[in-house]
Amino acid sequence: MSKFSVKFRGVRGSYPIADKDFLQYGGNTSCVEVNVNGHLIILDAGTGLINVGNELLGKYIASGLDSNERTPMKATVLISHIHQDHLQGFTFFRPLHIPSSQINVFGNVNYNESLADELSELLFGKSFPLD
């Protein structure tokens, strides 16, 4: 029997919001977590992705005493389109910064630039330098 679950991690558009009037649906931007038979698929990388990453990191740390014993974090991230509200959490997705992580990212070409170029600019460009 297949095991399938969906969790909405962010459903806001344009920008995240933190206000008591918005607690019912949360304040994070686009991010949906889908688990299919133990495979993690993430739809869009809005600010909801930050919590997904933190939870993955917690499981990773709990899985062994050191990086040699730990189970690598695995996920497939699908980016629907290159808009800021669909990428705001990407730079803060902690599994990206752990060398043993196995994160596959797929998305559309935008304005004749590849997804890799767009994400490189986001991660290493002047607006968010990680040296």
Spans of features found by a protein language model:
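Binuclear metal-dependent hydrolase catalytic cores
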Residues: 1-131
